[in-house]
Curated annotation (Swiss-Prot):
Belongs to the influenza viruses PA family. A motif (Nuclear localization signal 1 (NLS1)) lies at residues 125-140. It comes from Influenza B virus (strain B/Ann Arbor/1/1966 [cold-adapted]). Transmembrane segments: none annotated. The gene is PA. Pfam families: Flu_PA. Its main location: host cell. Plays an essential role in viral RNA transcription and replication by forming the heterotrimeric polymerase complex together with PB1 and PB2 subunits. The complex transcribes viral mRNAs by using a unique mechanism called cap-snatching. It consists in the hijacking and cleavage of host capped pre-mRNAs. These short capped RNAs are then used as primers for viral mRNAs. The PB2 subunit is responsible for the binding of the 5' cap of cellular pre-mRNAs which are subsequently cleaved after 10-13 nucleotides by the PA subunit that carries the endonuclease activity. One of its GO terms (molecular function) is metal ion binding. This is Polymerase acidic protein. Influenza RNA polymerase is composed of three subunits: PB1, PB2 and PA. Interacts (via C-terminus) with PB1 (via N-terminus). InterPro entries: INFV_PA, PA/PA-X, PA/PA-X_sf. The keyword RNA-binding does not apply. GO terms for cellular component: host cell cytoplasm; host cell nucleus.
Amino acid sequence: MDTFITRNFQTTIIQKAKNTMAEFSEDPELQPAMLFNICVHLEVCYVISDMNFLDEEGKTYTALEGQGKEQNLRPQYEVIEGMPRNIAWMVQRSLAQEHGIETPRYLADLFDYKTKRFIEVGITKGLADDYFWKKKEKLGNSMELMIFSYNQDYSLSNESSLDEEGKGRVLSRLTELQAELSLKNLWQVLIGEEDIEKGIDFKLGQTISKLRDISVPAGFSNFEGMRSYIDNIDPKGAIERNLARMSPLVSVTPKKLKWEDLRPIGPHIYNHELPEVPYNAFLLMSDELGLANMTEGKSKKPKTLAKECLEKYSTLRDQTDPILIMKSEKANENFLWKLWRDCVNTISNEETSNELQKTNYAKWATGDGLTYQKIMKEVAIDDETMYQEEPKIPNKCRVAAWVQTEMNLLSTLTSKRALDLPEIGPDVAPMEHVGSERRKYFVNEINYCKASTVMMKYVLFHTSLLNESNASMGKYKVIPITNRVVNEKGESFDMLHGLAVKGQSHLRGDTDVVTVVTFEFSSTDPRVDSGKWPKYTVFRIGSLFVSGREKSVYLYCRVNGTNKIQMKWGMEARRCLLQSMQQMEAIVEQESSIQGYDMTKACFKGDRVNSPKTFSIGTQEGKLVKGSFGKALRVIFTKCLMHYVFGNAQLEGFSAESRRLLLLIQALKDRKGPWVFDLEGMYSGIEECISNNPWVIQSAYWFNEWLGFEKEGSKVLESIDEIMDE
């Protein structure tokens, strides 16, 4: 306890508390709980005094309001507590005589120059009201009362004597002290100022003392050694401790939140002077093109699968005169095309290996030999040319239409399915029957959703990439980007979406990067939305006839990088199914609990009593668009996939920071009247994360739209309330 007091209170407060105890012949070492209580009481008195001031005309100011006017201000409260007893009585009598009031029978803690009243301050572990009436019974009306409880309640005889900020400051400090004490198991040791049962002291016998010393955990020789260690341990760190000491100096003004206080987040996303956010997912999604080859559905090696697909589309395979459509800033288009031809030749040859020769253009593409050279710290200090790199702050971007388009296309139904889920045995219990029914509806919606095909492509590619990275660390390998789909007739097709080249992959740590060059087929002309593709070099490599129409085929090339963590997450991308399934089931369960029977079928298709459930799934021309339960489910699933595909530190930060704002909006909707402080600071934390992540920028755009609808809804409710009041 002694160590705790030293760490959490200023030296002057501790010394005054010890002097007070000495006047009553109490020993601080024998009564540490009493010393703590006096320190808390003193600090609360000083907090109240430091927060409130008067000018020459008697007008009150808080510490924040009085900034810049300090020369004309004086404290509103005189602190009597902490003075030597004889001096305190002399000060109390002088103040009473000076202001023409009666001297109280008991010594006060504070004197209020504005109301000309003495004040008693009380701190309690119990209910503030109970302690208030005990004090009231003793003191009568001779002085005002300010009672604060560790339970976060208070009781004042004069409510106007202390503003909201002052009350909040005192209660926050008490909460902090209680939390610190609880961490060190010292909370129950305290004896408050109120009358509570006191323990009985008794001396431990020799046998009990020995048993106590034997019972301590390994690493401690005796009980006293363990207690000393626990008293001195610092579980929360020096920052929190120093903040606790600074609490009287911190100025926080709570404010009741209104709808008008909320503004859109990330105003820069509407700035047309900024570039559109570019596409930066690892693989193409809605723009992908798969070269299909019918198969019996048997398992094949990736190289065999890719070879068969390329043989079927020989005009694309044998193309030697491409047309350059678009070039990324740092790309060498000649090197990229040579590397593509090497990949095709490696896949097409008769050898079983898919190893690539280490040519100069392959080394350029994979960044071989371009890694930083590590040198000793001592050498760096002596070398004047060595300096710390400036941190790379992401450039701000504006919202782009392609993100919404991707979302729309990925959540649509197609005629093919790639999702491969294991079969489940027959139902035994009634609960299993309900689960199977829900699974059937869920799988029917998700199976033919475009997003599930993209998800499986990511899973298969990252599995192959991680295997090759571990098995062939020093080699360049060609990895086909493949998938397998089944159409509505039950026919299986192998799909080749492109080829990738893996560089050297000596991945010692989980965050060590391996370079991956991707070559992907697409029928999308990049010139239609050039702002989407600055990271890609695009060639036109021929055309295909689809449904009697000729379509150009483009090769999208990109130099990229990944690490073990991202590859492992790619292998686990099926987890997107779980989250969307859980959200669907939560909705069905809620409906079922209201109706009293299983509502799975009713939500999807409707029944005799209920029509199919609908949800708001987007906006069109400023109005909300409704969609079926199945459509909402596909939208949720697609959002989960996008969250994985575009996941990075910006998205993590945005999700965490914006959650607070969402909670505030929910509190406003529930009419709970939330209070906030530093709202602009919260906005700043959110907007710091809105830079160049496409999903974050789109989420901010959607949030702003939703906030607009909620504000409009609140105005309607307010007008209804006014009519009802009239």
